[in-house]
Amino acid sequence: MTITRFISDWSAITERLADPADRVVAVAPLMERLLPEAPSFITAAHRRPDPMHYARHRLHVASDGSLSLFAIVWQPGQWTPVHDHGSWGVVGVVEGVLEERNYMASDGEIRSDSGIRLKRGGTILLGVGSVTSFVPNPDHIHMTGVPETRKPVLSLHLYGRNMNSFHVYDVAHGTRKLVQLPQES
């Protein structure tokens, strides 16, 4: 599957299906078929790491901002903060093993930026060819990265919006804040 076909197919799916759970069920197999083709569209620039934090490289953003696809480069020891997405998403691993550590709201739904009690959930290890997905319920809260003992990772991340911001959670203080993400190349 080419990246052009992937973009066309997931755009059609999102026009046809409104429910985020239905969208990820339909899009996850497309991501699985796209992963082996990544060498044909991932350039040297898309593989460029950042020594300070994971590097996010934009592959496509829909003109209406409804969808975005990024290649993310992770060096050993690089992690996201605990965060949510405000969207559905599908993630596939091209190289390496990506680790996802999930969190759950102890009180159910989060309604404000303070008084949030999170507890750790499960851990998922995603190897080459693995695909995972998430839907807002009301949102998927996790941290993702690569432990110091593992090799670098290259992953593809598809979101149901232009992923230019997310909530970052301070687990110890029970707060969250909306953080703008840099629009990297």
What are these regions (language model features)?
Residues 1-39:
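N-terminal leader/capping segments at the start of a protein or of a new domain
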Residues 50-76, 131:
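A short glycine-rich, His/Asp/Glu-containing loop-to-beta-strand
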Residues 70-84, 136-139:
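Conserved short histidine dyad/triad with adjacent acidic residue
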Residues 105-141, 181-184:
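Short acidic-glycine-tyrosine-enriched beta hairpin
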Residues 136-156:
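Ligand-binding loop in jelly-roll beta-barrel domains
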Residues 156, 163-185:
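Extended, aromatic/histidine-rich regions of cofactor-dependent oxidoreductases associated
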